[in-house]
């Protein structure tokens, strides 16, 4: 199946490669990220469990969902969790490569998916990276940087700061790419409202105070690109209340929002080779799409460019935090294609911080700082050079991702790359 309106995804090649080799594969990610569209292009039979009539048939006999020409795509499989066991049994019974594709917008609350380990391969899909938005052809490959050898860094970008900010608020959800202005804001508001009013309920949560969930999301958005404690986020969400909800009340919000892939924190990096003393372990906060954070905070491209400050528990200009979130989203997409993991580094007290650490399977790393602006000075690279001194040969390269016009290497070896010029 080919769709002329389809936006090619970095994950497409990975999906096709795995489908040729494994019998069952599940594609996970938030609603609207493009899972169904990517999977449907490879499927011969499609079962949509968000259609009541199809769900009723499958609920009567889960094995009926597996019938038909293969690959069989089972969309929104989590609406009837026994499907997972049916697929697992089919794999155990000898289903060949490329038999089943499952797509889901949530992780069920039970341990069903854990029992599929080794039988059903899982792939994560995120909103569009900057490369996938087709603003400019990249000149630098993240995979090449991970390969080491100091690849040549060159290229010029005509993507301006205004263009980057427009992309932050425009969203990486494929279905929203043609929208702007009021229509886009309305769709993003509707997306957020559905999370609070419907998705949490479908996940089995009784939401007694929907406004508190919305306020928690808003406080989390204000903490974008920080390691603010969840206690501080809870306090910010409930400021002004005489009696604050307990941690036990608010923790389920976070857990379910992570299972819906709306909350998408970057974990702390734990070195697998050289130990580094005094590393802290809190995650760095990000929502699935920085446009969701902007909408929750009422930010527009104009207010971001005017220097709007992040609300507590964030600090500093909001545009910097959201640009880092856009960069983190993009790097995570590219790193997955390169079979690498992404974390962040922060020592206790915050005296050393590196925004993104991309780790290869062998434990060697690519260290990345994110800088809003084009001019990169010695202060911007000091933590990168510190890490290089600390673990030496285990750093394959160091990078500053910027909004500047040119990609180049500094005399100290740090690569300066506009985000628009970085691709997979």
Q: What residue spans do the PLM features occupy?
A:
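Accessory nucleic acid-recognition modules appended to NTPase machines
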Residues: 181-364
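Domain-level recognition of nuclease-like catalytic cores that cleave nucleotide substrates
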Residues: 403-424
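Hydrophobic positions on the alpha1 helix immediately C-terminal to the Walker A/P-loop
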Residues: 38
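Hydrophobic anchor at the beta1->P-loop junction of P-loop NTPases
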Residues: 27
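N-terminal pre-Walker A segment at the start of P-loop NTPase domains
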Residues: 1-16
